[in-house]
């Protein structure tokens, strides 16, 4: 076999060569850190299903945002754990409610931090669903009105992005119209545009304190559907989304790849709680090298076409200076 013309190994034979020809690179600019903030508590609460993740007491949020910024993280996604739930999740659109307070604290503490406000109701409703319940399930159009109100409150508090995750038909259009009518024409929308009804969300329910009984299959997407997944994102683009998202990320890289070929908008991909937990528990068992697997998994998401990755590993990677 001495007559080989093509020898790809020539470009892999040293670390310098491998670095020179590396096609996909990761940096902290690629990452958004999701954070959980609980009101009316004094102490941090560990999320047992997500080793290393804590619920942050609201009273310590300013300190945590400073820590996050000092580590080099430039963006966070805020999730609130409310102690004031009701049938509609009305605390989420109160001007002095938890949604508003989280954005206000983050922006007042670190003005340059890009704050994305998760816009949903599952942490604010007594039933744990993502909107207003009616006899047939979640009332889509009644929920749209409330999403608009929540979005305006978050924007007024300083949120840079409204991030609707309720999976309601028409939510991007309703939010865009509400923001524009209230004078927030420059507040952007990061839409959870392709959000699957995934079993990988399991640990998140503990982290966010969800009261859900049942499932969300009537409004979140069937994991088996590829064409519908692309359609959902393209609908949100047509309604005025500034960025699109695929959630979860790891098991849906085919969707990220195809969406990248169908849109010019930035794409986010959410490495969800179950993906995080699998890596963490496998590493704790000594089955894998955590750092190497984290970087490989994040690299695969970016390689598939994601511009931003939402990951619970972001702060650890930043503080250990694994990424810069």
UniProtKB/Swiss-Prot annotation:
EC number(s) from the headed UniProt entry: 4.2.1.24
Molecular-function annotations in GO: magnesium ion binding; porphobilinogen synthase activity; zinc ion binding
Keywords in alphabetical order: Allosteric enzyme, Heme biosynthesis, Lyase, Magnesium, Metal-binding, Porphyrin biosynthesis, Zinc
Amino acids binding 5-aminolevulinate 2: 273, 312
Binding site for 5-aminolevulinate 1: 205, 216
Residues at which Zn(2+) binds: 120, 122, 130
Pathways involved: Porphyrin-containing compound metabolism; protoporphyrin-IX biosynthesis; coproporphyrinogen-III from 5-aminolevulinate: step 1/4
Record's keyword annotation contains RNA-binding: no
Functional note: Catalyzes an early step in the biosynthesis of tetrapyrroles. Binds two molecules of 5-aminolevulinate per subunit, each at a distinct site, and catalyzes their condensation to form porphobilinogen.
Protein's UniProt name: Delta-aminolevulinic acid dehydratase
Organism: Escherichia coli (strain K12)
């Amino acid at each position: 076999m001495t007559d080989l013309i093509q020898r790809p190994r020539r470009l892999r034979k040293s670390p310098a060569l491998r670095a020179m020809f590396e096609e996909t690179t990761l940096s902290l600019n690629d990452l958004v850190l999701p954070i959980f903030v609980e009101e009316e508590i004094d102490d941090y609460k560990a999320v047992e299903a997500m080793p290393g993740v804590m619920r942050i007491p609201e009273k310590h949020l300013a300190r945590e945002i400073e820590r996050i910024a000092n580590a080099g993280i430039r963006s966070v996604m805020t999730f609130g754990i409310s102690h004031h739930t009701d049938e509609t999740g009305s605390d989420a659109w109160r001007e002095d409610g938890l949604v508003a307070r989280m954005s206000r604290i983050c922006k007042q503490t670190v003005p340059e931090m890009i704050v994305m406000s998760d816009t949903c109701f599952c942490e604010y409703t007594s039933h744990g669903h993502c909107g207003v319940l009616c006899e047939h399930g979640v009332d889509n159009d009644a929920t749209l009105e409330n999403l608009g109100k929540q979005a305006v409150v978050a924007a007024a508090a300083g949120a840079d992005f409204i991030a609707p995750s309720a999976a309601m038909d028409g939510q991007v259009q309703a939010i865009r119209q509400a923001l524009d009518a209230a004078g927030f024409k420059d507040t952007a929308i990061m839409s959870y545009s392709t959000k699957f009804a995934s079993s990988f969300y399991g640990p998140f329910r503990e982290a966010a304190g969800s009261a859900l009984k049942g499932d969300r299959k009537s409004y979140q997407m069937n994991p088996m559907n590829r064409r519908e997944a692309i359609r959902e994102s393209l609908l949100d683009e047509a309604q005025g989304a500034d960025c699109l998202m695929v959630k979860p990320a790891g098991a849906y890289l085919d969707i990220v790849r195809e969406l990248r070929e169908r849109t010019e908008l930035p794409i986010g991909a959410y490495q969800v709680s179950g993906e995080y937990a699998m890596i963490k528990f496998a590493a704790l068992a000594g089955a894998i090298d955590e750092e190497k697997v984290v970087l490989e998994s994040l690299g695969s998401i970016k390689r598939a076409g994601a511009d931003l990755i939402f990951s619970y590993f972001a702060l650890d990677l930043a503080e250990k200076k694994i990424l810069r």
